[in-house]
Amino acid sequence: MAIHLYKTSTPSTRNGAVDGQVKSNPRNNLIYGQHHCSKGRNARGIITARHRGGGHKRLYRKIDFRRNEKDISGRIVTIEYDPNRNAYICLIHYGDGEKRYILHPRGAIIGDTIVSGTEVPISMGNALPLTDMPLGTAIHNIEITLGKGGQLARAAGAVAKLIAKEGKSATLRLPSGEVRLISKNCSATVGQVGNVGVNQKSLGRAGSKRWLGKRPVVRGVVMNPVDHPHGGGEGRAPIGRKKPTTPWGYPALGRRSRKRNKYSDSFILRRRK
Protein backbone atom coordinates (compact mmCIF):
# COMPACT_ATOMS: atom_id res chain seq x y z
CA MET A 1 0.00 0.00 0.00
CA ALA A 2 1.06 3.60 -0.58
CA ILE A 3 2.61 5.77 2.12
CA HIS A 4 0.40 8.71 3.10
CA LEU A 5 2.15 11.99 3.97
CA TYR A 6 0.39 14.47 6.23
CA LYS A 7 0.09 18.13 5.31
CA THR A 8 2.22 20.33 7.56
CA SER A 9 -0.42 21.77 9.87
CA THR A 10 0.95 21.00 13.35
CA PRO A 11 4.37 20.02 14.73
CA SER A 12 3.16 16.47 15.37
CA THR A 13 2.12 15.94 11.74
CA ARG A 14 5.06 17.75 10.15
CA ASN A 15 7.16 14.60 9.86
CA GLY A 16 4.43 11.97 9.89
CA ALA A 17 4.23 9.28 7.20
CA VAL A 18 1.76 6.42 7.66
CA ASP A 19 0.35 3.53 5.65
CA GLY A 20 -2.40 4.11 3.14
CA GLN A 21 -5.95 3.87 4.38
CA VAL A 22 -6.49 0.14 5.06
CA LYS A 23 -9.57 -0.54 7.15
CA SER A 24 -9.90 -3.20 9.83
CA ASN A 25 -13.27 -4.91 10.26
CA PRO A 26 -12.34 -8.32 11.68
CA ARG A 27 -14.77 -11.23 11.83
CA ASN A 28 -15.90 -12.06 15.36
CA ASN A 29 -15.11 -15.77 15.09
CA LEU A 30 -11.52 -15.06 14.00
CA ILE A 31 -10.50 -12.74 16.86
CA TYR A 32 -10.03 -12.98 20.60
CA GLY A 33 -8.83 -10.70 23.38
CA GLN A 34 -5.27 -10.74 24.66
CA HIS A 35 -3.96 -10.34 28.19
CA HIS A 36 -1.85 -7.17 28.11
CA CYS A 37 -1.01 -6.71 31.78
CA SER A 38 2.54 -8.10 31.78
CA LYS A 39 4.13 -4.78 30.66
CA GLY A 40 7.48 -6.50 30.31
CA ARG A 41 7.35 -8.01 33.83
CA ASN A 42 7.57 -11.64 34.85
CA ALA A 43 5.36 -13.46 37.36
CA ARG A 44 7.30 -11.85 40.24
CA GLY A 45 6.76 -8.34 38.88
CA ILE A 46 10.42 -7.87 37.93
CA ILE A 47 11.21 -6.09 34.65
CA THR A 48 12.55 -8.63 32.16
CA ALA A 49 11.99 -6.54 29.00
CA ARG A 50 12.62 -2.83 29.40
CA HIS A 51 10.77 0.01 27.66
CA ARG A 52 7.41 -1.75 27.46
CA GLY A 53 4.07 -0.68 28.86
CA GLY A 54 0.82 1.03 28.00
CA GLY A 55 -0.33 0.94 24.42
CA HIS A 56 -3.73 0.67 22.82
CA LYS A 57 -5.87 -2.39 23.46
CA ARG A 58 -5.73 -4.98 20.69
CA LEU A 59 -7.76 -7.93 19.49
CA TYR A 60 -5.66 -10.80 18.19
CA ARG A 61 -6.49 -12.08 14.71
CA LYS A 62 -6.20 -15.85 14.24
CA ILE A 63 -3.83 -16.24 11.29
CA ASP A 64 -3.72 -19.49 9.31
CA PHE A 65 0.03 -20.17 9.18
CA ARG A 66 -0.52 -23.90 8.51
CA ARG A 67 -2.51 -23.46 5.27
CA ASN A 68 -4.02 -26.92 5.75
CA GLU A 69 -7.12 -26.38 3.59
CA LYS A 70 -5.69 -28.71 0.96
CA ASP A 71 -6.75 -28.57 -2.71
CA ILE A 72 -9.66 -26.21 -1.96
CA SER A 73 -9.65 -22.89 -3.79
CA GLY A 74 -10.13 -19.74 -1.77
CA ARG A 75 -10.96 -16.18 -2.79
CA ILE A 76 -9.49 -13.02 -1.26
CA VAL A 77 -12.44 -11.03 0.11
CA THR A 78 -10.74 -8.26 2.11
CA ILE A 79 -7.29 -6.83 2.80
CA GLU A 80 -7.14 -5.60 6.40
CA TYR A 81 -4.84 -3.89 8.88
CA ASP A 82 -3.58 -6.03 11.76
CA PRO A 83 -2.35 -4.18 14.90
CA ASN A 84 -0.31 -7.22 15.99
CA ARG A 85 2.11 -7.22 13.02
CA ASN A 86 3.47 -4.85 10.38
CA ALA A 87 2.15 -6.96 7.48
CA TYR A 88 -1.42 -6.77 6.24
CA ILE A 89 -3.75 -9.78 6.35
CA CYS A 90 -6.31 -11.18 3.90
CA LEU A 91 -9.66 -12.75 4.66
CA ILE A 92 -10.08 -15.88 2.54
CA HIS A 93 -13.42 -17.52 1.70
CA TYR A 94 -12.84 -21.17 0.74
CA GLY A 95 -15.11 -23.24 -1.46
CA ASP A 96 -16.24 -25.44 1.45
CA GLY A 97 -17.46 -22.43 3.46
CA GLU A 98 -14.36 -22.09 5.66
CA LYS A 99 -13.14 -18.53 6.37
CA ARG A 100 -9.57 -17.81 7.46
CA TYR A 101 -6.98 -15.04 7.65
CA ILE A 102 -3.60 -15.35 5.93
CA LEU A 103 -0.67 -12.99 5.46
CA HIS A 104 -1.18 -10.65 2.52
CA PRO A 105 1.16 -11.58 -0.38
CA ARG A 106 2.63 -8.63 -2.24
CA GLY A 107 0.56 -7.80 -5.32
CA ALA A 108 -2.51 -9.78 -4.29
CA ILE A 109 -5.80 -7.95 -4.76
CA ILE A 110 -9.40 -8.57 -3.77
CA GLY A 111 -10.91 -11.27 -5.95
CA ASP A 112 -7.72 -13.26 -6.52
CA THR A 113 -7.87 -17.03 -6.02
CA ILE A 114 -5.36 -19.03 -3.98
CA VAL A 115 -4.97 -22.72 -3.16
CA SER A 116 -2.71 -24.91 -1.05
CA GLY A 117 -1.67 -28.52 -1.51
CA THR A 118 0.70 -30.63 -3.57
CA GLU A 119 1.27 -30.05 -7.28
CA VAL A 120 -0.57 -26.72 -7.27
CA PRO A 121 0.46 -23.91 -9.66
CA ILE A 122 3.53 -21.85 -8.73
CA SER A 123 1.67 -18.57 -8.41
CA MET A 124 1.52 -15.82 -5.81
CA GLY A 125 -0.23 -16.81 -2.58
CA ASN A 126 -0.32 -20.56 -3.23
CA ALA A 127 1.15 -22.83 -0.53
CA LEU A 128 2.91 -26.09 -1.35
CA PRO A 129 5.83 -28.26 -0.19
CA LEU A 130 9.36 -27.15 -1.05
CA THR A 131 9.94 -30.36 -2.98
CA ASP A 132 7.36 -29.25 -5.58
CA MET A 133 8.91 -25.80 -6.11
CA PRO A 134 11.52 -24.99 -8.78
CA LEU A 135 14.86 -23.50 -7.76
CA GLY A 136 14.88 -19.72 -7.46
CA THR A 137 11.31 -19.46 -6.21
CA ALA A 138 10.62 -16.50 -3.90
CA ILE A 139 8.74 -17.71 -0.82
CA HIS A 140 7.53 -16.64 2.63
CA ASN A 141 5.73 -18.16 5.65
CA ILE A 142 8.12 -21.12 5.72
CA GLU A 143 7.72 -24.12 8.00
CA ILE A 144 10.66 -25.35 10.08
CA THR A 145 8.85 -28.39 11.50
CA LEU A 146 6.46 -30.30 9.26
CA GLY A 147 2.84 -29.52 10.12
CA LYS A 148 3.64 -26.85 12.71
CA GLY A 149 2.91 -23.92 10.41
CA GLY A 150 5.03 -21.16 8.94
CA GLN A 151 7.61 -19.59 11.24
CA LEU A 152 10.14 -17.92 8.92
CA ALA A 153 9.82 -14.85 6.64
CA ARG A 154 6.51 -13.53 8.01
CA ALA A 155 7.28 -9.82 8.52
CA ALA A 156 6.22 -7.10 6.07
CA GLY A 157 8.32 -7.23 2.90
CA ALA A 158 10.07 -10.47 3.93
CA VAL A 159 11.05 -12.92 1.21
CA ALA A 160 13.30 -15.98 1.12
CA LYS A 161 14.73 -17.83 -1.86
CA LEU A 162 14.96 -21.54 -2.61
CA ILE A 163 18.51 -22.03 -3.87
CA ALA A 164 19.14 -25.81 -3.78
CA LYS A 165 17.56 -29.22 -3.15
CA GLU A 166 19.57 -32.28 -2.22
CA GLY A 167 18.50 -35.50 -0.57
CA LYS A 168 15.82 -34.88 2.04
CA SER A 169 16.70 -31.19 2.55
CA ALA A 170 16.23 -27.90 0.74
CA THR A 171 18.61 -24.94 1.05
CA LEU A 172 17.07 -21.52 1.64
CA ARG A 173 18.49 -18.01 1.74
CA LEU A 174 16.52 -16.17 4.43
CA PRO A 175 15.87 -12.40 4.58
CA SER A 176 18.60 -12.00 7.22
CA GLY A 177 21.19 -13.47 4.84
CA GLU A 178 21.34 -16.76 6.72
CA VAL A 179 21.57 -19.89 4.58
CA ARG A 180 20.08 -22.97 6.20
CA LEU A 181 18.70 -26.43 5.50
CA ILE A 182 15.01 -27.31 5.88
CA SER A 183 13.15 -30.52 5.14
CA LYS A 184 11.82 -30.63 1.57
CA ASN A 185 8.45 -31.80 2.90
CA CYS A 186 7.89 -28.51 4.76
CA SER A 187 5.48 -26.07 3.15
CA ALA A 188 5.90 -22.43 2.17
CA THR A 189 3.86 -19.76 0.41
CA VAL A 190 4.90 -18.44 -2.98
CA GLY A 191 5.72 -14.73 -3.23
CA GLN A 192 6.74 -11.90 -0.92
CA VAL A 193 4.90 -10.56 2.11
CA GLY A 194 3.09 -7.33 1.31
CA ASN A 195 3.43 -3.82 2.77
CA VAL A 196 7.04 -3.52 1.61
CA GLY A 197 7.06 0.23 2.30
CA VAL A 198 6.68 -0.18 6.05
CA ASN A 199 10.27 1.01 6.60
CA GLN A 200 9.31 4.37 5.09
CA LYS A 201 6.82 5.07 7.86
CA SER A 202 7.53 7.92 10.25
CA LEU A 203 5.51 8.10 13.45
CA GLY A 204 6.06 11.85 13.66
CA ARG A 205 5.53 12.23 17.40
CA ALA A 206 6.21 10.51 20.69
CA GLY A 207 2.55 9.74 21.36
CA SER A 208 2.37 7.45 18.34
CA LYS A 209 5.18 5.39 19.81
CA ARG A 210 3.31 5.14 23.14
CA TRP A 211 0.24 3.81 21.30
CA LEU A 212 2.41 0.88 20.23
CA GLY A 213 3.21 0.03 23.86
CA LYS A 214 6.79 1.33 23.76
CA ARG A 215 8.10 3.55 26.56
CA PRO A 216 10.98 6.07 26.45
CA VAL A 217 14.58 4.82 26.35
CA VAL A 218 17.00 6.57 28.74
CA ARG A 219 20.74 6.47 28.06
CA GLY A 220 22.84 4.80 30.71
CA VAL A 221 25.44 7.59 30.67
CA VAL A 222 22.94 10.05 32.18
CA MET A 223 21.97 7.70 35.04
CA ASN A 224 23.50 7.31 38.47
CA PRO A 225 26.11 4.59 39.10
CA VAL A 226 23.57 2.59 41.10
CA ASP A 227 21.30 2.37 38.04
CA HIS A 228 23.73 1.67 35.20
CA PRO A 229 27.44 0.81 34.75
CA HIS A 230 27.78 3.84 32.43
CA GLY A 231 26.37 6.25 35.03
CA GLY A 232 28.06 8.72 37.33
CA GLY A 233 30.84 11.25 36.86
CA GLU A 234 30.95 15.02 36.92
CA GLY A 235 29.04 16.61 34.07
CA ARG A 236 29.31 14.97 30.68
CA ALA A 237 31.61 12.04 31.45
CA PRO A 238 32.67 9.00 29.39
CA ILE A 239 31.39 5.55 30.30
CA GLY A 240 34.68 4.65 31.99
CA ARG A 241 34.94 1.22 30.34
CA LYS A 242 36.64 -0.26 27.32
CA LYS A 243 33.35 -1.44 25.81
CA PRO A 244 29.67 -0.61 26.35
CA THR A 245 27.70 -2.86 28.67
CA THR A 246 24.09 -3.60 29.47
CA PRO A 247 22.51 -2.39 32.74
CA TRP A 248 23.47 -5.78 34.20
CA GLY A 249 27.13 -5.55 33.21
CA TYR A 250 27.13 -7.87 30.20
CA PRO A 251 28.80 -6.81 26.91
CA ALA A 252 26.46 -4.82 24.67
CA LEU A 253 26.33 -3.89 20.98
CA GLY A 254 27.28 -7.02 19.09
CA ARG A 255 27.30 -9.80 21.66
CA ARG A 256 25.74 -12.90 20.18
CA SER A 257 22.57 -13.91 21.98
CA ARG A 258 22.03 -17.29 20.30
CA LYS A 259 22.33 -20.28 22.63
CA ARG A 260 25.61 -22.17 22.24
CA ASN A 261 25.57 -25.72 20.89
CA LYS A 262 21.94 -25.47 19.87
CA TYR A 263 20.59 -28.58 18.16
CA SER A 264 19.81 -26.68 14.95
CA ASP A 265 23.36 -25.35 14.47
CA SER A 266 24.06 -28.23 12.09
CA PHE A 267 21.32 -26.96 9.75
CA ILE A 268 22.83 -23.47 9.40
CA LEU A 269 25.30 -23.34 6.51
CA ARG A 270 26.04 -19.62 6.82
CA ARG A 271 25.14 -17.34 9.71
CA ARG A 272 23.11 -14.22 9.22
CA LYS A 273 24.87 -10.98 8.40
Swiss-Prot record:
Molecular-function GO terms, alphabetical: rRNA binding; structural constituent of ribosome; transferase activity
Entry's localization field: Plastid, Chloroplast
Location (main, coarse): plastid
Keywords: Chloroplast, Plastid, Ribonucleoprotein, Ribosomal protein
Chain spans, region Disordered: 223-273
Gene3D superfamilies: 2.30.30.30, Nucleic acid-binding proteins (2.40.50.140), Ribosomal protein L2, domain 3 (4.10.950.10)
UniProt key word Mitochondrion: no
Gene Ontology terms: cellular component: chloroplast; mitochondrial large ribosomal subunit
GO biological process terms held by the UniProt record: mitochondrial translation
Subunit composition and interactions: Part of the 50S ribosomal subunit.
Family the UniProt entry places it in: Belongs to the universal ribosomal protein uL2 family.
Protein name, as recorded: Large ribosomal subunit protein uL2c
Organism listed in the record: Calycanthus floridus var. glaucus (Eastern sweetshrub)
Gene: rpl2
